[in-house]
């Protein structure tokens, strides 16, 4: 086996990544799953960052986990800028919301982002290049704490995601 370096991205909190195995270089579609609960302003920041991606072959699936503060109007405001779908489920926690999003995914590569993330413009391009270079079934890595975080928040952020490599899948 080998070690697969994972790109380091500037995000607010923990970002989770999962991917299905890429079957061919022709299938280059990402499905970005975003579970959200009562965070319309954060989902707006994340969606805005996704509009600037240099890699354009992706869809966005927002799964609202029973929010009492509506985020559907914010999601709908991106219909003309993103390939985006919105689903509402009864409050069941982020795990079920993520799983529901995966069920709706049409892309070959599934990425799960928390609603409080902000991704740089080259994020998907870098992920795609890394996935083409290394054969992996799943990947993850450290994220960068937002500059507005306190020292305690930065320490908690570091302690929860202090790894940066994942073993590559052997073929």
Each model region followed by its residue ranges:
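Acidic donor-binding segment of Leloir-type glycosyltransferases
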Residues: 47-88
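Conserved small/polar residues in nucleotide/adenosyl-binding loops
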Residues: 1, 164-171
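Glycine-rich, basic loop-to-helix element that forms the pyrophosphate-binding segment
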Residues: 89-105
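Short aromatic/hydrophobic "clamp" motif used to bind/position activated sugar donors
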Residues: 110
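Conserved donor NDP-sugar-binding/catalytic core segment of glycosyltransferases
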Residues: 122-153
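A structural helix-start
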Residues: 36-44, 64, 68, 120-121
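N-proximal low-complexity "stem/linker" segments adjacent to membrane-targeting elements
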Residues: 23-52
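The conserved acidic donor/metal-binding loop of glycosyltransferases
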Residues: 114-118
